[in-house]
Curated annotation (Swiss-Prot):
EC number: 1.5.1.5, 3.5.4.9
Gene responsible for this protein: folD
Record keyword Hydrolase present: yes
Functional note: Catalyzes the oxidation of 5,10-methylenetetrahydrofolate to 5,10-methenyltetrahydrofolate and then the hydrolysis of 5,10-methenyltetrahydrofolate to 10-formyltetrahydrofolate.
Subunit structure, as described in the record: Homodimer.
Protein name: Bifunctional protein FolD
Annotated catalysed reactions: (6R)-5,10-methylene-5,6,7,8-tetrahydrofolate + NADP(+) = (6R)-5,10-methenyltetrahydrofolate + NADPH; (6R)-5,10-methenyltetrahydrofolate + H2O = (6R)-10-formyltetrahydrofolate + H(+)
Length: 287
């Protein structure tokens, strides 16, 4: 079975669009782009367009690749103080000379719709309400719920320990709640006995950032696999590349119980959760 993200995302977005249509003023989403990374340009354009399509007011704030930390913090401060802005995200990756932690911490936690501020991360880890969950982990759980993949008591192997996906996702899956409450193993590319552990997992979430890392020999026939990875691999097609995930899809798809494709799996869910967080932020400010 293919766990396609597009129909799930469309359902989430349609609900948000209907709710926005009844609001007195539009939610505002500010997207900060530093530099001119081609992939980042595409992602920013996609997020701004999606927000606009839903009835939000969204704008990309572009700064050059040699922008200083002071320049960026001044922009973020202005956006923090702008009452028409309800969500702020800084597109990553950032140029290497910049301190990403300082930039993320400068965003008001109440407007941190990417869910990466230490305050929101802390609330997530403690199971406290009122914060924003990171978009990709939230999207993964929404995807699993849509396809009625049970999590309660199941062994979930998360491969990847990033602050954006692996760590927060593990924390969310472990929450003592009927919709999650999974048994989680957090792995990475250097974990010992990786293959043996993965073969015991009911659900594998691949977020290691290495193309085709998860092979057919590493998964069982009962495994449900969520592929978070997105990498460009050079080819001779018109684009000059194809997008592949962290899972060797062509060989794994015929063995596992279910798998999310790349593209069209987790990607649409990440954008949908960003819009959901922005709408929820607007509602909090409005109340």
């Amino acid at each position: 079975m293919l766990l396609k993200g597009t129909p799930v995302a469309e359902r989430v977005l349609e609900k948000i669009k209907q709710e926005i249509s009844h609001s007195s003023t539009p939610p505002g989403l500010a997207v900060v782009l530093i530099g001119n990374d081609p992939a980042s340009e595409v992602y920013v354009g996609m997020k701004v367009k999606k927000a606009t399509d839903l009835g939000m007011v969204s704008k990309a704030h572009r700064l050059p690749s040699d922008a200083t930390l002071t320049d960026i913090l001044k922009l973020i401060e202005r956006l923090n103080n702008d009452p028409t802005i309800h969500g702020i995200l800084v597109q990553i990756p950032l140029p290497k000379h910049l301190d990403s932690h300082a930039i993320i911490q400068a965003i008001s936690p109440e407007k941190d719709v990417d869910g990466l501020h230490p305050v929101n991360m802390g609330k997530l880890l403690l199971g406290q309400l009122g914060g924003f969950a990171p978009c990709t982990p939230a999207g993964i759980i929404e995807l699993l719920h849509y396809y009625e993949i049970p999590l309660l008591g199941r062994h979930v192997a998360v491969v990847g320990r990033s602050n954006i996906v692996g760590k927060p996702l593990a924390a969310m899956l472990m929450q003592k709640h009927p919709s999650t409450n999974a048994t989680v193993t957090l792995l990475h590319s250097q974990s010992q006995n990786l293959k043996e552990i993965l073969k015991t997992a009911d659900i594998i979430i691949a977020a290691v950032g290495v193309p085709l890392f998860i092979k057919e020999s590493m998964v069982s026939s009962h495994a449900v696999i969520i592929d978070v990875g997105t990498s460009r691999v050079a080819t001779n097609n018109a684009k000059g590349y194809i997008l592949v995930g962290d899972v060797d899809f062509n060989n794994v798809v015929t063995k596992c119980k279910a798998i999310s494709p790349v593209p069209g799996g987790v990607g649409p869910m990440t954008v949908a959760m960003l819009m959901k967080n922005t709408w929820e932020s607007y509602q909090k400010f409005s109340s």
